[in-house]
C-alpha cells in the first residue's frame, strides 16, 4: 500500500512539472484564464519623463530620470575617496546638517536629558 501511494505521488509530481510549465507560458485566448493574463508592464521612466531627442554626436545620453538627485557633474569619473582633495562632484554631493539639539533624542529641547535630571536638589 505504501509503495503504491509513493508511486502515485511521484507520478503526480511529474505530471505537475510537465504540464504546469507549458500552461503558464501559453498565449491566452479571449475569455480564458491562462498564463498570459498578466497586468501590462509599466513603461520605462525614460519614456514617461523625457521625450526622446536626438543627441549630437560625441555626447553620451543619460539614462537617469529627470527627478534624479544626481547632478550631471556626479556622473564624471573621480578619484577613489580618501586620496587627494575632493573633486567638485564630490563637494556638490556633500550635505549640510543643521546645528542644534538632536530632535530624535532630545525632542527639540536645548538641554540634554542628563542635565535636566541633575539639578542638585535632594
From Swiss-Prot:
Function: Probable extracellular signal that regulates meristem maintenance. May function as a putative ligand for a receptor complex including FON1. Regulates the size of the floral meristem and the number of floral organs.
Summary of the tissues where the protein is detected: Expressed in shoot apical and axillary meristems, but not in other vegetative tissues. Detected in a group of small cells at the apical region of the central zone of the meristems.
Signal peptide positions (record): 1-25
Extent of Basic residues compositional bias: 54-63
One Gene Ontology term from the biological process aspect of the record: cell differentiation
Gene that specifies this protein: FON2
Chief subcellular location: secreted
Protein name: Protein FLORAL ORGAN NUMBER2
Biased segments, Basic and acidic residues type: 111-122
Keyword flag Signal: yes
Record's GO cellular component terms: extracellular region
Phenotypic consequence of gene deletion: Enlargement of the floral meristem and increased number of floral organs.
InterPro entries to which the protein is assigned, alphabetical: CLV3/ESR
